Regions:
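Structural beta-strand/beta-sheet cores of well-ordered domains, especially the beta-sheet scaffolds
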Residues: 5, 14-16, 85-87, 99-101
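A generic structural motif
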Residues: 15-23, 101-103, 137-139
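A common structural junction motif
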Residues: 3-8, 47-48, 122-128
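A generic structural signal for short, solvent-exposed coil/turn residues
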Residues: 10-12, 81, 95, 122-124
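Short, well-ordered coil/turn elements that cap or connect secondary structure elements
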Residues: 2-4, 13, 84, 124-125, ...
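An extended, acidic, His-containing surface patch that forms the Zn2+-binding/catalytic region
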Residues: 28-96, 106, 110-115, 129-169
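Fold-level recognition of mixed alpha/beta catalytic cores in primary-metabolism enzymes, strongest
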Residues: 1-38, 42
Length: 169
């Protein structure tokens, strides 16, 4: 096996343990993060370290990890108040003999959970299954409302800053 950036190969029993070393962050602001699962998925695919069924699953997972904007899954979108959708791969684990990859998304008001789930199912095809989907409608309060103005004015008065309100998932 070949070495790769942010991948370590460690002898283990009769095989090799492949570890990915990423950079953590938050699903609402994933810029600059590197998902270790995505690194390992790419390494396995690039080096042909999977059978056909595993390849189909890994290709589906790769679509999640290819872009924190959801491009690989066909769910990328943006609107004025919220900006672009963000999505990250969370934890991967073995559950009842099946690999499970969690994901976490913050999406703008121009889409909804049902639409996103439908788009993800279309993108992953038969390589994986999307289950346990939960979503909440985006919540937004205009920056010029009295409550938000009171909060930011108080913050600026206490800190001496000149901060402005911002939206995050």
């Amino acid at each position: 096996l070949r070495n790769a950036p942010n991948i370590t190969l460690e002898p283990e029993g009769d095989g090799v343990r492949i570890r990915g070393w990423g950079k953590s962050g938050h699903a609402a602001m994933p810029e600059g993060t590197v998902n270790a699962i995505g690194l390992v998925v790419n390494y396995l695919l690039d080096n042909g370290l999977c059978n056909d069924a595993e390849r189909a699953y890994l290709e589906a997972v790769k679509k999640l990890h290819d872009s924190t904007a959801g491009v690989g899954l066909g769910i990328d979108c943006a609107d004025g108040p919220f900006g672009p959708l963000t999505i990250i791969g969370g934890k991967m684990s073995m559950v009842d003999g099946r690999m499970v990859q969690t994901m976490d998304s913050r999406y703008p008001t121009c889409t909804d959970g049902d639409t996103i789930a439908k788009q993800i199912r279309a993108a992953i095809g038969t390589g994986a299954e999307l289950t346990d989907v939960g979503s909440a409608k985006p919540f937004y309060i205009e920056a010029d409302t009295p409550a938000i103005k009171a909060c930011i004015d108080t913050y600026n008065e206490v800190t001496g800053d000149n901060a402005t309100p911002f939206t995050m998932g």
